[in-house]
């Protein structure tokens, strides 16, 4: 039987407060804010929006508060076409926020206030909902929802798992992540995250993740493109050239392109190309979702 969803995301739901600045100030320095804007965000959330714009069927597992930010997050998902039945709304607490400072070169600094994101428990996850997908895409969350993710991948033995560890999970180390990694169809770290996780460069680090049980590893290398491997295939995939305006959400966009390739049964190299293409569109505009392409642009 065909799954109801192509991808269900599981991660933080945040309102991003984006500050365009002259430069990102270091300790003891000052810098000027050029403009301020708000938009919905969260790593896995950005990825499922990228996928739904490519005409994939997506849903989400997460938590928001019954406040203005929470309602905006749900409304934006529904407007995009992301199913929200797996999202828990609670009366107490605040929805998550991220303050992002982006300079003229497109580089950024992030300050995260997770709030109710970090209170999601396994008991609040709808197992039937989560099991109706081909891929379950995980992004980093705090300890309580992390434990929920570990239990969930154990329960859903027939669902393919993808993981973007982010720096939060990379800092946990391989031992703590192994229960998830061994269930992963693909792990999608950045070069820096892979180094943090394994202590090795991207080629050697990818081999370690494969030994830990990952089916494939796709390493995001920024301006160098990406490296994809399943142990038998090994590909360096060059980037698409574009003018960088804002790197916020670039990795999330890349994940969307790569997962779309997997859904469409493309080979690893083509999946890497799709990841690079979607990321190139994202970084050409301000914000994590503004530049995410439609299917007709592929």
Question: For each predicted feature, which ranges?
Answer:
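Glycine-rich phosphate/adenosyl-contacting loop at the front of the ribokinase-like
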Residues: 1-63, 68-72, 79, 244
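Ribokinase/PfkB-type carbohydrate-kinase core domain
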Residues: 1-13, 76-89, 102-235
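Nucleotide phosphate-binding site architecture
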Residues: 16, 195, 289
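Short, basic and Ser/Thr-rich N-terminal targeting/leader segments
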Residues: 3, 54, 93-96, 222
């Amino acid at each position: 039987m065909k799954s109801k969803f192509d991808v269900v995301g599981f991660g933080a739901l945040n309102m991003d407060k984006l500050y365009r600045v002259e430069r990102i100030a270091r300790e003891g320095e000052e810098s000027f804010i050029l403009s301020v804007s708000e938009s919905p965000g969260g790593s896995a959330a950005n990825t499922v929006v990228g996928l739904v714009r490519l005409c994939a069927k997506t849903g989400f597992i997460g938590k928001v508060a019954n406040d203005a930010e929470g309602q905006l997050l749900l409304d934006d998902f529904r407007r995009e076409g992301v199913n929200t039945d797996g999202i828990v709304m609670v009366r107490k607490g605040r929805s998550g926020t991220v303050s992002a400072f982006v300079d003229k070169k497109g580089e950024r600094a992030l300050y995260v206030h997770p709030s109710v994101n970090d209170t999601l428990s396994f008991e609040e996850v709808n197992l039937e909902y989560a099991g109706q997908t081909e891929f379950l895409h995980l992004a980093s969350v705090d300890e309580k929802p992390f434990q929920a993710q570990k239990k969930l991948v154990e329960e859903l033995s027939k669902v393919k798992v993808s993981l973007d560890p982010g720096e939060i999970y990379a800092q946990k180390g391989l031992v703590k992540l192994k229960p998830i990694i061994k269930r992963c169809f693909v792990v999608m770290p950045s070069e820096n995250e892979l180094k943090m996780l394994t202590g090795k460069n991207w080629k050697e680090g990818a081999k370690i993740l494969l030994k830990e049980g990952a089916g494939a590893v796709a390493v995001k290398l920024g301006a160098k493109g990406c490296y994809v491997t399943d142990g038998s295939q090994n590909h360096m995939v060059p980037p698409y050239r574009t003018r960088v305006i804002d790197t916020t959400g670039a990795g999330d966009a890349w994940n969307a392109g790569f997962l779309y390739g997997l859904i469409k049964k493309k080979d690893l190299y083509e999946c890497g190309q799709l990841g690079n293409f979607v990321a190139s569109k994202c970084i050409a505009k301000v914000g994590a979702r503004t530049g995410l392409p439609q299917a007709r642009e592929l």
